[in-house]
């Protein structure tokens, strides 16, 4: 089931879903990542969906609100690493690390949702999300705490929480439209 969900996301992002967005400020960035996340959430079952505001917060943190070199040149908003140098990528400066390069911005979001559903580092996240999907009681702090394996930064989950709080305070009109998508 997970493999078919991930295949659906990838197919939609690469072939049937040509939506792209432009941004020149935080509001447009937040709106674009939100729309991509909501789109993919509507084509997969609830237990595989990403929490919209967390998806946006992580994209904001990982890409400096879309201003990072990887975001600007490769539409990579989540710091997705590429291990095969024959695939499109951008090399990190002063490092051998390569980051994935996407044709469209929403492809990065689809890849992030796929990683949430397949990555071994997100096992705890999936348990928490699935429990909350069944009970239909979303606890953002609990979900965010389960993301502590995503980054080496020990303060990462606190940064996500602060960014989520900022997003909900500064852009309530955007997140009101996604209430049915678990914020």
Regions found by a protein language model. Name each.
Residues 4-13:
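Sec-dependent N-terminal signal peptides
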């Amino acid at each position: 089931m997970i493999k078919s969900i991930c295949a659906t996301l990838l197919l939609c992002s690469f072939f049937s879903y040509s939506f792209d967005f432009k941004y020149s400020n935080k509001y447009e960035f937040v709106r674009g990542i939100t729309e991509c996340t909501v789109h993919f959430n509507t084509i997969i079952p609830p237990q595989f969906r990403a929490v919209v505001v967390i998806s946006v917060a992580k994209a904001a943190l990982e890409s400096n609100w879309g201003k990072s070199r990887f975001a600007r040149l490769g539409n990579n908003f989540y710091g997705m690493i590429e291990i095969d140098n024959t695939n499109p990528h951008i090399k990190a400066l002063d490092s051998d690390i390569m980051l994935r390069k996407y044709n469209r911005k929403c492809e990065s979001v689809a890849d992030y949702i796929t990683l949430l559903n397949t990555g071994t580092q997100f096992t705890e996240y999936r348990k928490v999300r699935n429990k909350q999907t069944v009970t239909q009681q979303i606890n953002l702090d609990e979900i965010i705490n389960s993301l502590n394996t995503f980054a080496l930064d020990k303060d990462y989950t606190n940064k996500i929480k602060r960014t989520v709080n900022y997003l909900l305070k500064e852009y309530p009109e955007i997140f009101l439209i996604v209430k049915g998508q678990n914020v």
